[in-house]
Amino acid sequence: MIIAANLKTNLTREKTAKYIKEVESFLNQHNISQEVFVFPAISNLISSSANVVVGAQNAYPTQNGAFTGEIGNEQLEEFGIKTILIGHSERRHVIGETQDSLIVKFNFYKNLGFKIIYCVGEPLHIREMGHEKMMEYISAQYVGIDAAYENLIIAYEPVWAIGTGLTPTLEDIKMIHKELKAKSTAPLLYGGSVKVTNVEEVLALDGVDGVLVGSAALYVEHFCTMCEYAQNIDKKNKKL
């Protein structure tokens, strides 16, 4: 299973380094073999540890150049970073990234062989228009994206659930993941108010290959517990 922490614009460089060290220690002590990713704020980028892959929340599709306020692959190379989040709802709806710009970014980092966690999901007003309209909206986010890319991970994140404490029902998550699984064989994560009190149920659902965790991941002990839950569920599934 895949457990990913999006730390967003939180923590300092010192606190991020401590966070990753604590996660690494926990994974070692508990023999956890799941894929674990941490996406720190840009100023806090550091190299991956043995069991924690550090990725970029965002980067401009360039090696370097005159792109004020951005970072490019040259800056990521310094830390050996080869993993990136693309299409997160906050990049789409707060920063204003368009599907066309995301396609350019996706293709640039795909051509460099990056592992890409590509995010899709619907805002509340689209969800309220009904299931068919919701799936049309989500399907449009696949346009121009190579869904067969071998280093692709997809994260479904209902925009209305992010940071609100609201979550779809387990049955809703299961149903949507089933439909999205038909679009790509890539691992499919769930994101959207994932927390330590609901993650075990979410991870146990058919079609859920892991979780992308936001604010709840800021509590390192909670994130570590989520990693342990994933390990236990993975072991249980392998016995079936």
From Swiss-Prot:
GO terms for biological process: gluconeogenesis; glyceraldehyde-3-phosphate biosynthetic process; glycerol catabolic process; glycolytic process. Disulfide bonds: none annotated. It is found in: Cytoplasm. PROSITE patterns: TIM_1 (PS00171), TIM_2 (PS51440). The gene is tpiA. Its EC number is 5.3.1.1. Pfam families: TIM. SUPFAM superfamilies: Triosephosphate isomerase (TIM). Substrate binds at N6, L7, K8, G163, S193. The keyword Ribonucleoprotein does not apply. Transmembrane segments: none annotated. Pathway: Carbohydrate biosynthesis; gluconeogenesis; Carbohydrate degradation; glycolysis; D-glyceraldehyde 3-phosphate from glycerone phosphate: step 1/1. The active site is at H88 (electrophile), E157 (proton acceptor). It comes from Sulfurimonas denitrificans (strain ATCC 33889 / DSM 1251). Belongs to the triosephosphate isomerase family. Homodimer. Involved in the gluconeogenesis. Catalyzes stereospecifically the conversion of dihydroxyacetone phosphate (DHAP) to D-glyceraldehyde-3-phosphate (G3P). Keywords: Cytoplasm, Gluconeogenesis, Glycolysis, Isomerase. It catalyses: D-glyceraldehyde 3-phosphate = dihydroxyacetone phosphate. One of its GO terms (molecular function) is triose-phosphate isomerase activity. One of its GO terms (cellular component) is cytosol. Its main location: cytoplasm. This is Triosephosphate isomerase. The keyword Cytoplasm applies. It comes from the Bacteria. InterPro entries: Aldolase_TIM, TIM_sf, Triosephosphate_isomerase, Triosephosphate_isomerase_AS.
